[in-house]
Amino acid sequence: MMYDDTIAAIATPPGEGGIGIVRISGKDALSILERIFVPVRPGRWKPYRMRYGHVVDGAGVRVDEALAVFMRGPRSFTAEDTVEISVHGGPLVVERVLQQALAAGARAANPGEFTMRAFLNGRIDLTQAEATLDIITARTTTALALAEAQLGGWLSHELRRIRALLIDPLAYCTALVDFPEDEVEPQDVETPLTAAVQALDTLVATAEQGIIYRQGARATLVGRPNAGKSSLLNALLRIDRAIVTPIPGTTRDTLEETANLGGVPVVLTDTAGIVESVDPVERLGVERSRQAVAQADLLLLVVEGVSQPVDDDREIVALTRDKRTVLIVNKIDLIDGADAVQECMKFLKCAYENLRGVPFDATIAVSALTGQGLDMLGATVARLLLGDSSPADGRLVTNVRHRDALARAATHARDALDSFRRGVSPDLLAVDLTAAINAIGEVTGEAVGDDLLHAIFSRFCIGK
């Protein structure tokens, strides 16, 4: 699909930088470039060759010195003729260059329109288009590696393979409807269907872990006032994000920041100490703390290594009873000797588990002040959120939309297999097989409507 118009946008982030790039794509990209860019050395444009010159306005006045490159379609990201102009990275300069492109006949691009053209022109499928956005928004190296693997096409290839496994049984079913006197060997239907079901189930099983790597999880720090929750937040973030003082009750509201814990982007929520109070501001902070506990995927119960449980701890510990919880024994820098730390951990674990009524999922000793134990804490949080397995060659389904569509495909394929084994008529088998193939098409983009495409690409930035 080739578009009649040509689009342009700034492809670099807003603000000052070393360079700014204006991207132009469409059938008139080269003619627009020739109108607004004057190379130092005249001559015909050769694709994929960078040229030095100046961007000029309609009167021939120089706007900025620049480097420009022309990429002829379909050997470009959008599969259309594409131009990129690199200029100095000041916001005003880049905006002026864009305005020259628009004045020369380009249209301002919509969010994600370059990537959408790449998809609609067959350059990439929808899984790869979504992976492009995931690369931009990745918050950990693991999430980035998963997105790059998906952009590389592993999921596209696997779904084409599964689709082919479903096409042959569908062809047999269609033939039997038209020519019922023909015979089909059972293995010609059962073998590929069984393989398709197994492959779809395998993909869906990876999604729980993959989605956490991509979207992250929520962990809430809870504990009595002055247990060191804010200090621990700062230590995990490696910045002084929360105000820390020796005065109990310094934190009056919830505070959220994202940390990379064991390769997982975890939204950490620091909370006000949960205590009874007549202060209306403090009571509001406590209520928000309770809400943060309810929304958390994991709780981090912070206690002081140099103190013992008190009555106020009962209510706090009760909030953790139905949630996965790590008991964090903080301030171990105040305890002399490794043996004493172990004895302290053993005592506090027993005491707080007696209050809780059920064991904690893990107990970790840390010092927010010195950093001792923080790496182990990060690894423990990641293990509890993900399980013990690690990504296999980056092959995890990371998108909720993909998971849901593939789960439906697996259900339809399984129903078709069960129906075949029970001798159900071919026309009914074909219904489930077609539904499974269409569900796979929702993932790759072969069976999606304009509304879904708009929803996906509108999340991209302008210029991508």
From Swiss-Prot:
Which parts of the sequence bind K(+)?
A: N226, T245, I247, T250
Sorted UniProt keywords: Cytoplasm, GTP-binding, Hydrolase, Magnesium, Metal-binding, Nucleotide-binding, Potassium, tRNA processing
Cofactor(s), names only, from the UniProt record: K(+)
Domain TrmE-type G spans what residues?
Answer: 216-386
**SUPFAM superfamilies given for it?**
P-loop containing nucleoside triphosphate hydrolases
Q: Superkingdom of this entry's organism? A: Bacteria
Task: State what this protein does.
Answer: Exhibits a very high intrinsic GTPase hydrolysis rate. Involved in the addition of a carboxymethylaminomethyl (cmnm) group at the wobble position (U34) of certain tRNAs, forming tRNA-cmnm(5)s(2)U34.
Q: What class of enzyme is it?
A: hydrolase
Query: What is this enzyme's EC?
Result: 3.6.-.-
Indicate the family of this protein.
Answer: Belongs to the TRAFAC class TrmE-Era-EngA-EngB-Septin-like GTPase superfamily. TrmE GTPase family.
InterPro entries linked to this entry: G_TrmE, GTP-bd, GTP-bd_TrmE_N, GTPase_MnmE, MnmE_dom2, MnmE_helical, P-loop_NTPase, Small_GTP-bd
| Record: residues binding Mg(2+) | S230, T251
Query: Which Pfam family, just one, is annotated for this protein?
Result: MMR_HSR1
Q: Which CDD domains match?
A: trmE, TrmE_N
Q: What's any GO biological process attached to this entry?
A: tRNA wobble uridine modification
> Which residues hold (6S)-5-formyl-5,6,7,8-tetrahydrofolate?
R23, E84, R123, K464
* Entry protein name: tRNA modification GTPase MnmE
Which compartments is it annotated to reside in? Cytoplasm
Query: Which PROSITE patterns does the annotation name?
Result: G_TRME (PS51709)
The source organism is Roseiflexus castenholzii (strain DSM 13941 / HLO8)
